[in-house]
Amino acid sequence: MLYLFNNHKLNHKMKKHLLTSIFSLFLVFLTFAQNKSHWAEVKDNNFPLSKNSQRESFPKEFKVMQLDLNLLKQSLSVVPNRLKSKTSNVIISIPNTDGVLERFQIFEASNFEPELQAQFPEIRSYVGVGIDDKLAILRMSLDPNGIQAMIFRTDKRNEFIEPYSADGRIYAIFTSSRIKGKLPFTCSTQDQSLANRLSEKAGKQSETLRSSSSELLTFRLALSCVAEYSNYFGATNSSQVGLVLAAFNATMTRVNGVFEKDFTIHMNIIANTTNVIYYAAASDPYSPGATGAGGAWNAELQSTLTSVIGEANYDIGHLFGASGGGGNAGCIGCVCDSGKGSGFTSPANGIPSGDTFDIDYVAHEMGHQFGANHTFSHSNEGSGVNMEPGSGSTIMGYAGITSRDVQSNSDDYFHYASIFQVETNMESKTCPTRTSIANTDAPTVNAGLNYTIPKSTPFILTGTASDPNGVLTYCWEQIDNAGATQINANSAANVTKASGPNWRSYDPVSVPSRYFPRIQSIIANSATTAGLEINVEALSSVARTLNF
């Protein structure tokens, strides 16, 4: 976890009774303001739905709550910067999927460069540290039209909050388990491999990677969009640029939340990004959706950023489209370098917002730009990191868009292989700003000894770890790369599979042990665990080596 905060009580000694009384009244008012709920149950179900909630991939099960946006804004009027303060007196409540309000200690975590943030003070991004659930982390964006939020959980599914009514009063709270859509997204990024560098470091378990350096890396993000994207959010000219920046901010709040957690990386949108936001399709420098998403946007974006922004003025460039159903990073691991401004993401359903767009698509393509290859094994790209069965389930997989899906959506974290690739790539990068963070001690981790066990025998892996800065979470992942023949139907977990991935990744938990297969499968006396379309766990009935 990147940020760990401690609560501190304010202790003041007042010499005069008058000052004591005034201060006491202030504390009473502050407590009342923060305890007064911003949320209420929905009593009237007669309201128009937001465009985002009408997408096919929107969950079927969710909780709806009504938000008093003005009251929330008042509570957030003075929030400390997380990099300048270790404590905050701002506490707000956020509903979970059961409708229960949970308290979070709030800090500002802007996605804008200071100049851009000063120009648009009404668009904000926050991080919250759980009080009632001490392992919960909130990432929330705020703009004049409402909020979007993402809550990282431990031992249960992560949660999302998105506008459900068109007027931004009613919100849907749902988990990250979503239905599979019928409009596939295709990532056409060529897997130019960092495999050589990865292989050089393979097996060097004692080597300390960049993530242990106690530094947050901040990159300057030049974010552009096609006119269709701006129009989707109601912006038809430059006077409405705030509508587009609010959408940028909502997406990057979630993307940065994941990148900070897994990579200790943050991206700030540059002030001049407003110069590459377009409003009229006839005059923007980008091809129509079908052609652009087919690959034309790579070169068009790079040319636009070079001429309008200047290569010295950004570290990573990306384009948001609104249709076409494709993504392409342009290159892999090229932040700071040639080709750094050629990545794009565009949905197939005409809805460039929401959890699917943010996590499954944008985080995936930006993951490529920072150095991560695909981790699925339904096809083999020779990168050395096809370590997940079938579609995979982590961000660099293809969950929900293949014919061999582990599940219908990506989980909002990166596989170990992706983290290793990105951290390896970051060691040679000089363009980011480096900021020391409070969490200075890397966890001490021991995965245990190697074992030989009988075939078809269930087993448990238990590690040990300690960290003086806070509570740890644990995620066991298999790290065996798929062979050339272990694709398509052979990418599924199988008891006779002699090599390659046979165990899917599951969300991090608070305990250091994992059952193989899942305890439910063991109780059912089954050697396999079924996923959405394939088996995702299988006890080997043949001799083989497994690496975790």
Q: Which sequence ranges carry the predicted segments?
A:
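Extracellular acidic, Ser/Thr/Pro-rich low-complexity tracts
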Residues: 453, 464-469
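Proline/serine/threonine-rich low-complexity linkers at boundaries of modular beta-sandwich domains
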Residues: 426-444
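N-terminal prosegments of processed precursors
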Residues: 34-166, 297
